[in-house]
């Protein structure tokens, strides 16, 4: 039996709501419904009664519940034990492409330069969207997440690493926002909430990407502008701030599981500055 089906069943039974279960599992509501139907088909019974928003366990669902909890608990314990033996020298760090390109690449270099303190440690630099990385962290498939948003789950520990400055850049001097096409570089959902006010409510991005390198290479060809970290843009050269734009300060957080068996290691690694300029 697919353990993901049992995991979904347990979440729906806990929340009594397909939408909230989908949010907790980082799935769509239709995916949650499909998984429950799959499990019901495998067992040949209905597990929930559905009357509008009132979702309840059937008698069969009530009987399955303790077995599902035991199976998932056993499975998680097995995964943890196997991971502990096979990954004791591995350490995975996840972040978006833009964060790796603009600042974390340099930090990774500093980690290797300080390897005397952690001899034999093997790093994995993982690139993905924040939502996917949060899920991996929750499932113990990732050791550390670096992101611009504070955690929203109680089981996570976090540390504010500092702040960095974003500015709107283009490839030629003395340009105004109205003269340029907008390239959206993803800096997190909370940044996008303010994006319309910073750019213009009617501005439709000509390109959306999670890669700062790609955005920087395209702005000249597309007569565009995009938000880039100031320290990174200065090192790149050939970039100019848009005249009628402002700057924006963004936080950077390290996030990990509170009960991670690598807590001490994580705190040691975070003693090495992640940002070149911390303020």
Curated annotation (Swiss-Prot):
Gene3D superfamilies: Periplasmic binding protein-like II, Winged helix-like DNA-binding domain superfamily/Winged helix DNA-binding domain
UniProt key word Transmembrane: no
InterPro entries: LTTR, LysR_subst-bd, Tscrpt_reg_HTH_HdfR, Tscrpt_reg_HTH_LysR, WH-like_DNA-bd_sf, WH_DNA-bd_sf
Keyword tRNA processing included in the entry's annotation: no
Pfam families with a match to the protein in the record: HTH_1 (PF00126), LysR_substrate (PF03466)
Keywords: DNA-binding, Repressor, Transcription, Transcription regulation
An MF annotation (GO) of this entry: DNA-binding transcription factor activity
Annotation: DNA-binding region: 18-37
Cited function: Negatively regulates the transcription of the flagellar master operon flhDC by binding to the upstream region of the operon.
PANTHER family: HTH-TYPE TRANSCRIPTIONAL REGULATOR HDFR, TRANSCRIPTIONAL REGULATOR
Record NCBIfam families: PRK03601.1 (NF002946)
Miscellaneous comment as given in the Swiss-Prot or TrEMBL entry: The expression of the hdfR gene is negatively regulated by H-NS.
Protein's name in the database: HTH-type transcriptional regulator HdfR
Naturally occurring in which organism (per UniProt): Escherichia coli (strain K12)
């Amino acid at each position: 039996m697919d353990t993901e089906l049992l995991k979904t069943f347990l979440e729906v039974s806990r929340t009594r709501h397909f939408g909230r279960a989908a949010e907790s599992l980082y799935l769509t509501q239709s995916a949650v419904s499909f998984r429950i139907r799959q499990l019901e088909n495998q067992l040949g019974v209905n597990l929930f009664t559905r009357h509008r928003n009132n979702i309840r366990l059937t008698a069969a669902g009530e009987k399955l519940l303790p077995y599902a909890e035991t199976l998932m608990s056993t499975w998680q314990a097995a995964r943890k034990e196997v991971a502990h033996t096979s990954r004791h020298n591995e350490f995975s760090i996840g972040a978006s492409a833009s964060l790796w390109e603009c600042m974390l690449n340099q930090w990774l270099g500093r980690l290797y330069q300080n390897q005397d303190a952690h001899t034999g440690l093997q790093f994995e630099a993982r690139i993905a969207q924040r939502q996917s990385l949060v899920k991996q962290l929750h499932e113990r498939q990732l050791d550390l997440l670096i992101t611009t948003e504070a955690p929203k789950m109680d089981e996570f520990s976090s540390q504010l690493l500092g702040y960095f400055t974003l500015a709107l850049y283009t490839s030629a001097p003395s340009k105004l926002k109205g003269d340029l096409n907008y390239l959206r570089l993803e800096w997190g959902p909370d940044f996008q909430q303010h994006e319309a006010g910073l750019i213009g409510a009617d501005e439709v991005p000509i390109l959306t990407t999670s890669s700062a390198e790609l955005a920087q290479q395209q702005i000249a060809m597309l007569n565009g502008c995009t938000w880039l970290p100031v320290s990174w843009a200065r090192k790149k050269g050939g970039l100019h701030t848009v005249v009628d734009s402002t700057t924006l300060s963004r936080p950077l957080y390290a996030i990990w599981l509170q009960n991670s068996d690598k807590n001490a290691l994580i705190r040691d690694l975070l003693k090495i500055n992640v940002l070149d300029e911390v303020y």
